Amino acid sequence: MTHPKILLRQASATIFSALLPCLGGHAQDRCQAFNLETLPKREVRAVWLTTLSNLDWPKGYATTQEGIERQKRQLTEILDRYAEANINTVLFQARVRATTTYPSALEPWDRCLTGQEGRAPGYDPLRFAIEECHKRGMELHAWLATIPCGPWTSLGCRRLRAKGLRLRKLDGAGYLDPSDERVAPYLASVCAELTEKYDIDGIHLDYIRYPDGWPRATRRNGDTPDYRRANINRIVRAIHEAVETRKPWVKVSASPLGKYSDLTHYSSHGYNARDKVYQDAQLWLKQGWMEQLYPMQYYRGNHYFPFVPDWVANSHGRTLASGLGTWFLDPREGRWTLADISRQMEVSRWAGMGHAHFRSKFLIENHKGIYDFEQRFNLFPALVPAMKGKRDDRLAPPTDLRLDSGLISWQGDAPYYNIYVSDHWPVDTDNPANLLLARFAHKQIATALAPRLFRGWPFVAVTAMDRYGNESQPLQYQPPVATTYQPQLPKNLYLANDGQQLDLSEALRPLLPMDIDRYAVATLQGVFLRSYLRPLQATGPAQRIDISSLANGVYWVYAHNKRTKKMVRVGSFEIDRQQVGFVR
């Protein structure tokens, strides 16, 4: 029998070799023509929203009612931008440096909200953020910086020392000592308070490690690398147990260093999670102490790509999201190109990982076009992967699905519902192109809020979803006209092609000045096959897209309006390569 470690190495090598076509100099050209058949229905699409030093939010202090409203408005504008890009997970910094952005019985307020440590802002920012994320179908994970405690003289740091916890001073800042056996239960109590008080979807642990600059393990008095890993493991396990016993659907995750350890053919160059900062992150997944990992893969080239399959091969069936160094797109921070990030997003998706941007500011400010790319990359909504091995046995499909007087309604006891629409019946709920609304917390919606309905998308299906992310079987709605409904292909919408290229100029003429940023091709049954960026030559007779990879048959063509965020069907075409020249 082959040893399990050999099988893992073989799996890693297979994945890495399959990724090679996307790693060359022209990878962006090859990888941006997204194959819509491979778009995942489930995937983490996350952003770290930093409150430390007001880096992402808030901008301005809440010392008056006007200041409170300004902070709320800023946050909702950020969340709207996330929703428009089909982001589904917000990592909201709730514990900053032994200080909080929520009212806590254990730790003081952070200064980012009012400009003063320990001063309440007059509202609960975390509760507000949770409510606003949930309105938009997004999860909110409370992001905690675990070991760092801020400047040595700061209020949070002084409070921890007053509690009797052991801290070490490094470069003027305080850090909890992981070897102090009181640290694990204390941090677990912080997470327990959060879990009990708030409807959070996850606890996200940052800096769950020995800090850079900590004295090296001397091996004296038992201070060995294994001892240090055991100290961090003790904290992780205590937090997991505190959360699991209260709300088992709350996902515990962490952001370890982006390289777990040295690989057979690729070195971590002395900086990795396991051996440098004592994060045995792959063990956390194996033991079930973590449901998700967000490795901070803030590297390029051979410092990034070989380590993707290593994480995947050792995920133990749990969820991974590649942490992206999006801030390096800012010329003041680094010299990364859009292709550096877009290749990583393509490769991590192909390997089965989601992605997370560090940090919010650089994504929504669209540095080098990264926000535009994010919108194209996330063409459809996606569900967060279901938790491994957990399910609510009471989960049942919704009932009594009705469409009356411009209102879609149904009955059920689930906390969330997913709504699918299509121009084909029954609606294929495995196809992400049909997902209209994810993680919807109500039992009715006005069709005016779902513009695809009754505009060529007459069929509806609804599934129930439990807190663990599991879906029920769909409840399908078939209008009375469904038995006779067939897509009609008006003659004036047939588009010319030669089996290799499709001419779009005629179809787009009546739509100009429509702000089109991409096209898509679908089967007549509504299954999207490929997406294309807008051709470089945006006007004139050369408005063509490559259809050489499509089989003979008849297809729909859609154009995406960047301004209105809607897909518009612009025509159909038939591929018949037995004919010569452009055909209709």
Give the predicted meaning of each segment.
Residues 281-282, 289-302, 321-389:
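Substrate-binding cleft of secreted/luminal carbohydrate-active enzymes
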Residues 42-44, 50-72, 141-193, 197:
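Active-site-adjacent "subsite" loops/lids of carbohydrate-active enzymes
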Residues 451-471:
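Beta-strand-rich modules
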Residues 467-484:
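Extracellular fibronectin type III
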Residues 189-190, 196-306, 310, 314-317:
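Active-site neighborhood of glycoside hydrolase catalytic domains
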Residues 73-99, 198:
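Catalytic domains of carbohydrate-active enzymes, especially glycoside hydrolases
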